Each structure stands twice: as C-alpha cells, then as structure tokens.
Amino acid sequence: MAISSFIPKVWSARLQENFHKALVFGSLCSRNYEGEISQWGDTVHISNLSDITVRPYDPTKDLAEPEALSGTDIVLTIDHGAYYNFLIGDVDAAQARVDLMDGAMRNAAYQLAEDAEKYILATIRKGAGTKVSGAIPAADKGGLYGLLISIKNALDLKHVPRFERKLIVPIAIEGQLLMDERFVNGSAAAEARLAEGAIGRAAGFDIYVSADLTNEIIAMIPDAVTFANQIARTDAYRPEKGFYDGVKGLNLCGCKVVQPDGVYIHTITA
C-alpha cells in the first residue's frame, strides 16, 4: 500500500468503528456532545436542568405563572489524548502491506480504546456520588443477588431513574452470576430482551463485564456520565531515513460525571 493511496477519512472511519467496538464504559455513557469537539482544550457547556415544579390542578383556579427553566452549567473539557505512530516497510508485498495496515489499525483502535476506558473509569471513580465497600453477603442472606438488590435500593432512595440502569462487574463476578437462576442471560432472551453488549440482566440492571475491574461493582445510568471522543488526526507520511510508510493518529476525549447520584461504586472486600 503506497502512501499516495492512503485515504485518511477511510482509515479514520475504520479506526473509529473498531474503537467503539472495544469500549465498555465508553459505550454506556452519554455521547450527546461528541460532534462538538475538534482539538485539545475544547470545552462543551452542558446544562443540567433543575427539577420542574409539578402543582396540584384545580379547575376553578388559573394556572400559576410559568417558571423559567433553571439549572447549573457544567463544563466538559477535552483534556485527554493518546496517539499512535508506526511504520510499514517498502519490502513487504503489496497485498501483505494492505493486510498488515488493516491489522495494525485494528490494534491501534483497540489500544486507544483501552486508554480511553482507563480514563473514563478514573473519572467515574473520582466523581461517583456513592462509594461503599463490603463483603458479598452470605448465601442465607441473599448472596451476590442480595448485594445487587441493595445497590438497586440505594439508587431508588436517591430517585435515580430505573430506565436504562447499567451494572459493570469484574470477570470473576460474571462467573458467579451465571450460576444464579435469577440472572437472565442470553439463553433466556425470550423472557427478557437484553441491551446491546449486555451479558444478562438482574435486579433491574443490564449487566456488562469489564476486564479493567477487579473488586468493584459499578452501577450507573448513561445520563450520569458524559463522554466525548474524536479521532482528531489520521496522517500518512514518508520518513526521511529508511524506506517506509508511516502512519500516525491522535485520539482526543473528555469525560465528566454530571449527575453524581447516578453513579454507585461498591468495592468488594474479603
């Protein structure tokens, strides 16, 4: 593949597609502001509306004056970036170079996604409204499923919407859930339609697995965390020294917890 035939938009789109496929936390966040970023330091203003007042209706009285919408202005800053930069030698056969480029770009997308996941997870850990720790209850006290019910109840008490609640668990917890008959997995799809990417459903949560977690269970709703990402640059170049084609790219992103009550972290202890 010659540098003259490299089409940045095509490879950037392919990179972005593979990037999104590799995300777990990134796929569960609100992505409403993704098209508004282009460079490091860009800011996006997010209006977090206050609750609308609901009043009792009396047909014999006039309606109260309409209230002006109010809320807080939250700033999302694009403050995280990662790049790749690799070479492909001229000596490779033409077809091999195309295959090598495709494989290299897929791997670059995966590595960028891993970097973004760690960044999002760090943001979630910092901004979560509730952080607790404790052992998984004994079997006669509900076991793991009992813990999920406790997390559900905690969110209910904070009036977190029940719609689209997500639960992200470590790999070890997935194994325990699969042995619980109250856990609805893919084989029971006729009973409950699973959200895309979810391994199952329990206690009102769509459940996902992340290899980046070891002893934490994270509950959240998408509106609680905003994530914006942009493959800002995908460039081909010809290094002066050697007979190579070079490809480099830059990924920029920003993440913010905008509704802390919508994020709950339980750290499992022995």
Regions found by a protein language model. Give the residues of each.
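Generic detector of well-ordered alpha-helical segments enriched in charged/polar residues
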Residues: 8, 12-16, 20, 121, ...
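Short Gly/aromatic-enriched secondary-structure transition segments
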Residues: 59-67
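Alpha-helical scaffold segments that mediate packing/assembly in large oligomeric complexes
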Residues: 91-158, 265-270
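Extended, solvent-exposed, turn-rich assembly/linker loops in the middle of proteins
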Residues: 128-198
